[in-house]
Amino acid sequence: MRREIGAVLVTSISFAGISPACAQCCDHILMMDDSYGDGWNGGSLQVLINGSPIGPFAATGSGSDTTFQVCNGDALELIYTPLDYENENSYMLFDQWGNIVFADGPTPATGSVYTGTGDCTQVPAPGTMPSAALPIDTSDCVLADNSLVPGTGIDPGCASYQGGDIWFALPVPSSGNVVVSTADTGGLNDTGIALWTGPDHFNLSPAGCDDDSGPGYFSLMLASELPLGDTLWIQAFGYGGGTGAFELCVTDPGTVTLESSELPIVMINTLGQTIVDDPKIDALMEIKYNGPGNLTYVTDPANVYNGHIGIEIRGASSAGYPQRPYGFETRDPLGANLNVSLLGMPSENDWVLLSNFNDRSLIRNQLASAIAEGMGQYAPRMHLCEVLIDSSYKGIYVFGEKIKRDNGRVDIATLTGSENSGDDLTGGYILTQNYWDANNSFESNYTPIDHPTFDVHFIYYYPQPDTITQPQRSYIAEYVDSLETALYSVDFADTSVGYRKHMDVKSFIDYFLVNEVSRNNDGFKKSVFFHKDKNSNGGKLKAGPVWDFDWAWKNIASCSIFEATDGSGWAHLINDCFTDNYSCGWYVRLLQDSTFNNELRCAYDDYRTNVLDTANLFAYIDSVGLLVQNAQARHFQKWPILGVSGPAPEVNACAITYAAELDTLKAWIAQRLDWLDANIPGVCSNAGMNGPEAVGSLSCFPNPSTGTFHFQGFVAGSGPLVFTIHDVAWREMDRIVLSPGQIAFDRTLVRSGTYFFTLNDGGHLLQKGKLVVL
């Protein structure tokens, strides 16, 4: 991780080789950095002492340093000569105490850039420099005051640092874990803290920086698995240069030992390597699970998986969380992909371990997937598990499926490099919206109708950017263009020539509802997926799968839409907020179609009787709470984030117990559903189900049913009787013709939900009713 010191980006602060002296002469260190890692490419820095050159010096590789002596009264001058790739070059000159004498770069100024006089007599006041850090330990809460502290100029990159930093130090405890926090004492009320580690104050490496993860605008930071034997330096300061008194506390959460769990246990052996974000490293993995209701012990044999994997850090912002998320693939001993079924999930080789560091409920991602699946959509299957990496406890993770084209996942046709014409070319494709570049995406020819200056991009997810052919790139871009042309046309609502010709409406309704019920901050701007099968398999663009809900189901201080504490706000209007990636904004146009609105309302009303029923959602949450009642204690000892906002800056005070966290989530959901009950647009008329109650003598049982209904009775009539079943969007699901008289028959529906049946005689409605499939 790179941190800014003054105007210079560095990966660490190194003063190796300095022997502090407070006499006539003292050591200075010149640290040179190259961000690309190939040295300064001809650039150089000359150092003159009393007019005599002692250089020139230049960075080699990613960086290098040199030490030289300066005496009291010496004339010191720096002269920089540029050459190629100057935007990669930076440097810093420090005195014996770590004070920055001069720093510049990237793209340093040229010529004579600094002149000064040597001074080896200045000794820093206590707390004003890493070399003069004040002592503190894990039993301490100390009163600090930075009112008279000038500041080091070492910018840690958060909390709008403008100096005024005061420094503390302590040995890294035997657990390797500390929690550092600030609190109110009636003085400074907005702080920042940065943590640094190293064997001494001449060799500091950044360990993180925090603005206001604590109560109010105070700071809280967890540092885990710090190098034993090192010293931890704490840099505390006021936001934006603020000064005053505050409390600083350091605690040791201890070491978590895992012996048994009600959850699956995942044990990863890195073979002495460090897991990085790319490429995957070869490692070994064991998965142990004795099934629901049984304890699984760390000492049990691996009964789910025992073999090779390739593993890497995954995610964007989440990759920087202390509890890192991982992506991995199961492999055979030779390193080839190995498809296996894990924890009841269909056989595949690509999997994820999602971090719960931003989700104290341990349920947000699972809940969203369960809802989407209950709506009949594919959503990644997920299981909670406890993870050990190299015998070190890492907490509760979400073990799940990576979004991928596969018959058991996103079930669309394969698309090979040789399929470039005809029906072959039409699918399957997976697109996503996320952080894009010119090589991995195409730009829409349209802009959101409510934000005409915004550019919209679609990333090639399958086939991947490095394998998709040019005809395939052109085809899917042209298909999206045809969809948008229809969507933004005058006849957009026409069922023959409008957007429905290109779009699978039900999938877009379901995607909308999952992300609006959860008011997902990311669901319409990034972590957005679409997929399309071949035309011979239907061929319309579908929304989904749903993904990434750790910023959902809560009130977030980012924009009025997500800050609302009364359950209100439309997440699909994310473009109205300051956003890091623009939404395509299609729902703004779709909601101008009264038919779409009516279908949306009918679907919502239907789901409120089953998958979105408040009692059902609460029961699901309670079931997870019961499952992890023991594991959560270990998780929150490892990651003491209860009562802490975390990466998503929450508006409300955070619950301080896990049980209270689940109650908070349930209260949020109830309030959100109340608002949606009153504000989902459209009218659900159920088409032919309106009108006076019809008279008929058919009885139906069981109802509700698990799928099969038995009808019987006597019906008089003059001609053939037509019995039909419709779903809530009034699509015909079943039709049979019956003869008048005594009737008995069975009908089966395979998908859970609400349905309606009608019995007609020559167009005259004899009977109607509702069917519920559990």
Predicted regions and their residues:
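Residue-level detector of functionally pivotal "anchor" positions at catalytic/ligand-binding pockets or at interdomain
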Residues: 121-129, 251-256, 678-701, 716
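Acidic, Ser/Thr/Pro-rich low-complexity intrinsically disordered segments
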Residues: 25-26, 31-51, 57-62, 71-74, ...
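Internal "kinase-insert"/substrate-recognition segments embedded within catalytic cores
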Residues: 268, 329-335, 346-356, 376-380, ...
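C-terminal outer-membrane/trafficking sorting elements
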Residues: 19, 692-774
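Coil residues (strongly favoring Ser/Thr
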Residues: 66, 75, 138, 146, ...
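Conserved oxyanion/phosphate-binding beta-strand-loop segments in alpha/beta enzyme cores
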Residues: 301-357
